[in-house]
Every structure is written in C-alpha cells, then in structure tokens.
UniProtKB/Swiss-Prot annotation:
EC number annotated for this UniProt entry: 2.5.1.61
A GO term, aspect molecular function: hydroxymethylbilane synthase activity
Pathway noted in the entry: Porphyrin-containing compound metabolism; protoporphyrin-IX biosynthesis; coproporphyrinogen-III from 5-aminolevulinate: step 2/4
Residues with PTM S-(dipyrrolylmethanemethyl)cysteine: 242
Listed CDD domains: PBP2_EcHMBS_like
Pfam families: Porphobil_deam, Porphobil_deamC
HAMAP family: Porphobil_deam
Origin species: Legionella pneumophila subsp. pneumophila (strain Philadelphia 1 / ATCC 33152 / DSM 7513)
Required cofactor(s): dipyrromethane
Note: The porphobilinogen subunits are added to the dipyrromethane group.
Protein name from the UniProt record: Porphobilinogen deaminase
Length: 309
C-alpha cells in the first residue's frame, strides 16, 4: 500500500466526525502503517439545516460537496450515513463498502412519557422527516407534528427547553454519540418502519481508484451490504428521496431467507400502501423488483403524486 496520506471527506457535524473517525480507526487497524487525514466540510445541507429539506433540495445536499471533493481528488474517500445518499450516484463514483449496520430503528425521546402509546392527545412531537410524520399520524392521528432541525445536541436541547413533548431521532446516531441514555423507547418497526439504509455507514470513492477500493474492501459487511443495496433498489425504482413518506427495511431471517418490507403513505398517514416479500438471498434483486411492482400495482405512484414537490 502506498505511503501517501489518505484523505477522508466528511461533514463537520459532531456525528459525521465521529463516523469518519470510526472508519479511520477501522482502516488503521487493518493497515497499521496507513496515514489518514480528515477533510471536514460544510455541505449545502448543513447550511440549510434551518430550512425545510423539501424546499432546500433534499437529502443529496448532505453529500454534494463531499462528492465534488472526491471527483476533483481533494479527497480519496468519503464517509456518509447511507440514508443520506441519493438513489443515483454521480458518474465516476461508487459505494465501495457498506459497514456493518448499527441499530436501524427510530427512537422516541421524551422526558415525560414512556412510550408512543402514553402520549396524550395533541402532544407536540418534533421531527423533520415526512416518513416519521406520516407513520406517527397513521399510528395516532391526534398527535401534533412540529418541525425539528439541527444536529443531535441542538434537537435534544429544544426538547429540554419544553418546545416539544417528545422528539423522534435515529437510534444509531444517539448510540454512536454516547447518548443512548436519552432513548425512551425504540419504536417497533410495525409502527415505524425505518428509512432506506438507516443505521449503515458507507464509504464512497472514485471508480478508477483501485488502490482505495482495495484498502476499504475489508470494511464491507456482506449481509449489511446485501440488505442496504436491496433497500436502495426499491428506493431508486420508486424515485425515493426525503420528499416522500416512504419506508423500506430488509433483513435476513433465522431461516436464512431475505425478508423485505416497504410502505408508502400520504402526508397525514390516512392512506398507506405496504408490501412484504420473502425469498432466497441469491434472489435479492428479483425480490426488490417484485416488491416495487407490487407497491405500484396497489397504487403507490398515485399516492406519491399527492405529495407536494
């Protein structure tokens, strides 16, 4: 392996820096003589944190500048939360590794109430995710959803100030930051199905950089990668992004079968189309396509057309 310094592009948020350092530590463990530097960057998504992602341009804003750094060779690889990745990558880039998936579920945080079921009528719940909003309202239409933005610490501070009675965050982010003690309830996936690739870190690099691909290959977790790419296939075929209330989650059963579940909702949760497919691991792409076709047959695209663009 070359003696050059490897540069990792990352967002500047505390969670993103933790994730980049985590990947750095795993690489150094495999390649002890490796020299690695972080290249922290402020992305468009970070600048628009106070705005609605719908109007700001969506989840791709959190990776755009990092990908530009890869393409102009200021960075050798980029570390992302895979859930932030658009369905389509720019030409010249690929997801080289999907790290072992952490907790994929959503967490309720509330200083007053012990579960979703305990929330009173008209309780104010903080989230900026249409997926979470629609599933919350499908579970309990009497909840009041209020926009919540900022990094993890900012969101927790807003909860503590009394602005909300509860907030919803990704469990993985809280656990990575040593904040799992704030979790009141891990929300069951029959109430709130995760978003595509939630809980999984990915490493992106240039398609022509075979040296970097070899370097990070050992960080790829085959089962996590299989499940994440299956979810992303459904997401891509439905035109999925953070503009739509869409959830998809793939797991491997005890019987070593691939189980794929997906759902599409309208914004207030009053309408939902869901599907579940199961089959052999080797048929992951077929299962993903079958799930997509089933959702479409049931009217998913018509339902999604009701969502403001």
């Amino acid at each position: 392996m070359s003696a050059k310094i490897i540069r990792i592009a990352t967002r500047q948020s505390p969670l993103a820096l933790w994730q980049a350092n985590h990947v750095r530590e795993m690489l150094v463990k495999q390649w002890p003589n490796l020299s690695i530097e972080l290249l922290p960057m402020i992305t468009s998504g970070d600048r628009f944190l106070k705005d609605k992602l719908l109007s700001a341009g969506g989840k791709g804003l959190f990776v755009k500048e990092l990908e530009e750094a890869l393409l102009d060779k200021r960075a050798d690889l980029a570390v992302h939360s895979t859930k932030d990745m658009p369905a389509q990558l720019p030409d010249g880039l690929l997801l080289t590794a999907i790290c072992k998936r952490d907790n994929p579920f959503d967490a309720l945080i509330s200083p007053q109430f012990k579960s979703l079921a305990a929330l009173p009528k008209n309780a104010i719940i903080g989230t900026s995710s249409l997926r979470r909003q629609s599933q919350l309202l499908a579970y309990n239409p009497n909840l009041q959803i209020k926009t919540l933005r900022g990094n993890i610490h900012t969101r927790l501070s807003k909860l503590e100030s009394g602005e909300y009675q509860a907030i919803i965050l990704a469990a993985a982010g809280l656990e990575r930051m040593g904040l799992a003690h704030h979790i009141t309830q891990l929300i069951p996936d029959d109430i709130m199905l995760p978003t595509c690739a939630q809980g999984a870190l990915c490493i992106e690099c240039r398609t022509d950089d075979l040296e970097i691909q070899e370097l990070v290959h050992g960080l790829n977790d085959p089962i996590s990668a299989l499940c994440v790419h299956t979810e992303r296939r459904v997401n891509a075929k439905l035109g999925g992004n953070c503009h739509i209330p869409f959830a998809v989650y793939c797991t491997i059963t005890e019987e070593k079968l691939l189980l794929l579940r997906a759902k599409v909702l309208n914004m207030d949760g009053s309408q939902m189309i869901d599907d579940e497919q199961q089959g052999k691991i080797a048929e992951a792409e077929v299962i993903a396509d079958r799930c997509t076709e089933s959702l479409m047959t049931k009217g998913a695209m018509s339902l999604l057309s009701t969502i403001p663009s």
